Curated annotation (Swiss-Prot):
Lineage of origin: Eukaryota, Viridiplantae, Streptophyta, Embryophyta, Tracheophyta
Descriptive protein name: EID1-like F-box protein 2
Naturally occurring in which organism (per UniProt): Arabidopsis thaliana (Mouse-ear cress)
Coiled coil: none
F-box domain span: 16-68
Length: 249
């Protein structure tokens, strides 16, 4: 069920919305009891601005920590209590495959976005997507590919997504800027609406990425946004071929 966001208040000191409903502590315990169900959090966000502020400030953060505790601990290990692009955007990235619209980021690929029940994000896998000169310092978590099989002429497609740690300080970002890589002229990040760089256009996709994905080398394309969210697509090798592929370092 899709619920339209409705802001019925302006969150002022005299706002009636802040009176007569459960306190933040009770709402926190309620959503915690429901195991940080993203459907519940999203529904609460649509009630009014007060609930939306609470969700963005607290509930989505706890959802991320519950869904991927080790990754969240690493992303915050520098001492920051926030992440690039907001907790809500990161929560969406954890559970949503963005797909692609025709004429969008991935040309003629047209696959609807959808929620995924569970996805594994790996820091080890992320190293395979970094240019060799960036692997010493940069940290990137990347998901296993979300498989969309038998896509006609496109074959078996895999969509993957990821998140950089402290992207604003990363070597990848500095290298993209040094190369003068332009932003995509029309499309933005589906998770935070920030501008996107094409790693393919910047010629920064290493061979190791195709081996990690089990994909054809010339079929991989991915983007990184200003907040360090990554999304990409590849054409997967037939299972018999990809099983025998060795990882390129």
């Amino acid at each position: 069920m899709i619920i339209a966001k409705q802001y019925r208040c302006i969150h002022s000191a005299t706002c009636h919305c802040t009176k007569g409903h459960l306190s933040e502590e009770v709402l926190f315990l309620m959503v915690q009891h429901l195991n940080w169900n993203p459907n519940v959090i999203a529904t609460l966000s649509c009630v009014c601005k007060w609930f939306d502020d609470l969700a963005k400030r607290l509930l989505w953060k706890e959802f991320c920590r519950a869904r991927a505790p080790k990754m969240m601990s690493d992303l915050q290990s520098s001492g920051s209590h926030s992440v690039d692009g907001s907790w809500r955007a990161l929560g969406k990235l954890l559970i949503y495959c963005s797909g692609s619209s025709k004429g969008g980021l991935f040309n003629d690929v047209q696959i609807s976005g959808h929620f995924v029940h569970r996805t594994r994000f790996s820091r080890t896998s992320g190293r395979s997507f970094l240019p060799p000169q960036c692997r010493t310092d940069d940290i990137l978590y990347v998901s296993d590919p979300c498989e969309h099989l038998d896509q006609g002429e496109d074959g078996d497609l895999g969509f993957f997504r990821g998140i950089f740690k402290s992207f604003s300080m990363s070597k990848v970002r500095k290298l993209l800027i040094k190369k003068g890589t332009p932003f995509h002229p029309t499309e933005v990040c589906p998770y935070c609406k920030a501008k996107l760089w094409s790693m393919l256009q910047a010629k920064m996709i290493p061979q190791s990425a195709s081996c990690r994905l089990g994909a054809y080398e010339d079929s991989i394309e991915y983007y990184v946004c200003l907040n360090g969210h990554m999304l990409g697509v590849c054409t997967l090798l037939p299972l018999s071929d990809s099983e025998g592929a060795s990882e390129f370092q």
